[in-house]
Swiss-Prot record:
It is found in: Plastid, Chloroplast. Keywords: Chloroplast, Plastid, Ribonucleoprotein, Ribosomal protein, RNA-binding, rRNA-binding. It comes from the Eukaryota. Binds 16S rRNA, required for the assembly of 30S particles. PANTHER family: 30S RIBOSOMAL PROTEIN S14 (PTHR19836), SMALL RIBOSOMAL SUBUNIT PROTEIN US14M (PTHR19836:SF19). It comes from Ostreococcus tauri. The gene is rps14. GO terms for cellular component: chloroplast; small ribosomal subunit. This is Small ribosomal subunit protein uS14c. GO terms for molecular function: rRNA binding; structural constituent of ribosome.
């Protein structure tokens, strides 16, 4: 299981991304419609004032149960280990063992 601090850091990043999403879109739109280079540079300076962790690219997908960053299944929000265990226990509706 991942350290509690790593899980907490990731949830904090998710909150920051949601908080600043509208502001980031506004800045990007202003940059796109800017008429002069100076205007673009001044808008970019304002844009750089936003928190670094408010960018979506800094997010890392983690398992909701264990916090594991690798082997993550987007559809379920779980790592492969937890997904397998929950599927065997019948806790995931519509998921069953493959047979061909």
């Amino acid at each position: 299981m991942a350290k509690k601090a790593l899980i907490a850091r990731e949830t904090k990043r998710q909150k920051l991304v949601q908080k600043y999403a509208a502001k980031r879109l506004e800045f990007k739109e202003r940059i796109r419609t800017a008429e002069s280079i100076r205007e673009v540079v001044s808008i970019q300076r304002e844009f750089q004032g936003l928190p670094r962790n408010s960018s979506k690219v800094r997010l890392k997908n983690r398992c909701a149960k264990t916090g594991r960053p690798k082997g993550y299944y987007r559809d379920f929000g779980l790592s492969r280990h937890v997904l397998r265990e929950m599927a065997h226990q019948g806790l995931l509706p519509g998921v069953r063992k493959a047979s061909w």
